[in-house]
Amino acid sequence: MIEFKDVTKTFDAKQGAVHAVQDVNLKIEDGHIYGIVGYSGAGKSTLVRMLNGLETPTSGSVVIDDVNITTLSGAKLRAQRQKIGMIFQHFNLLWSRTVLENIMFPLEIAGLSKVDARKKAEHLADLVGLAGRETAYPSELSGGQKQRVGIARALANDPQILLSDEATSALDPQTTDEVLDLLLSINQKLHLTIVLITHEMHVIRKIADHVAVMEAGKIVEQGPVLEVFKRPQQAVTKRFVNEEVTPSLNDTTVVVDQLLAKYPKGTIVQLTFHGDQAQLPIVSEMLKKYPLDLNIIEGGIHQTQEGAIGSLYLQLTGDQEQIKGALAYLQTMRVETEVLNRE
């Protein structure tokens, strides 16, 4: 288990003390994929640097499997770091080395014989989908293939934890999904704890099971991914969720004003579906019971590791009693309903 206990990190600057991380308390269970999401400057990277001992907390402690790594130094800290692999946005490959030689590099540093290092590197190349590309140089690889080399290299010393710091930020959407699928597969095969640092809720939604949202150095919200998607509490969380679920309405501070200006008539309703609800014809059944004119403004269904989450914006026009009946029906079907206006 990973635990952050009352962790604060302060940097001295000309303008005074800068609190990069403030009073963070967080638990990450073994074998989970835990996402930490926030915009630039939220404190995500500082937090992860404290996890592998590259930064020391100003106060508080970071504990991994009952070992307080903030008290370690020298050989003990180096031994602890060997239990943690890390992948980055920029691949940090050795351009004069082949794929296999890049994967072998940390094994050579660890003292493995060349024969054993090569054998293990070949296995890792196959694990990350690079069989047949072992003799290629980084300049001959696509961005996704380079990141696969980075992942294989991070796994070389059999870490218990894999840190991913914006590892898909430089990749196109299709390659991002392929790399995320690989990380999910590795998590399942190796029972590896993965900590994802990202500013993209898509990354969290696709493979994480738990998420913490950071803003201004603080964790403002945390919980199972599906629960956070279903009921975001903080403004920054709502913005992240809307960016993923309803991308064309991604600024929660202006969503309602935009909708009311564009659709001045009728009743504008936001529906949120969870799990099996997202697969059922609930809206069409509603229209059979309550004959209304319906305009679908925006919508989408996305999968998380714990189930589907769907969001739908509707414009309903017609008899007010019929509209009230329709909204009551949706609530009986356990669809979360928010009326943004009334005609």
Curated annotation (Swiss-Prot):
Keyword ATP-binding annotated: yes
SUPFAM superfamilies: ACT-like, P-loop containing nucleoside triphosphate hydrolases
Subcellular location per the Swiss-Prot or TrEMBL entry: Cell membrane
One GO CC term on file: plasma membrane
Membrane topology: Peripheral membrane protein
Positions annotated to bind ATP: G38, Y39, S40, G41, A42, G43, K44, S45
Domain (ABC transporter) ranges: 2-241
Keywords from the named record: Amino-acid transport, ATP-binding, Cell membrane, Membrane, Nucleotide-binding, Translocase, Transport
Listed EC numbers: 7.4.2.11
Primary localization: membrane
GO molecular function: ABC-type D-methionine transporter activity; ATP binding; ATP hydrolysis activity
The reaction(s) this protein catalyses: L-methionine(out) + ATP + H2O = L-methionine(in) + ADP + phosphate + H(+); D-methionine(out) + ATP + H2O = D-methionine(in) + ADP + phosphate + H(+)
Taxonomic superkingdom: Bacteria
Biological function: Part of the ABC transporter complex MetNIQ involved in methionine import. Responsible for energy coupling to the transport system.
Assembly information from the UniProt record: The complex is composed of two ATP-binding proteins (MetN), two transmembrane proteins (MetI) and a solute-binding protein (MetQ).
Homology family: Belongs to the ABC transporter superfamily. Methionine importer (TC 3.A.1.24) family.
Descriptive protein name: Methionine import ATP-binding protein MetN 2
Gene expressing this chain: metN2
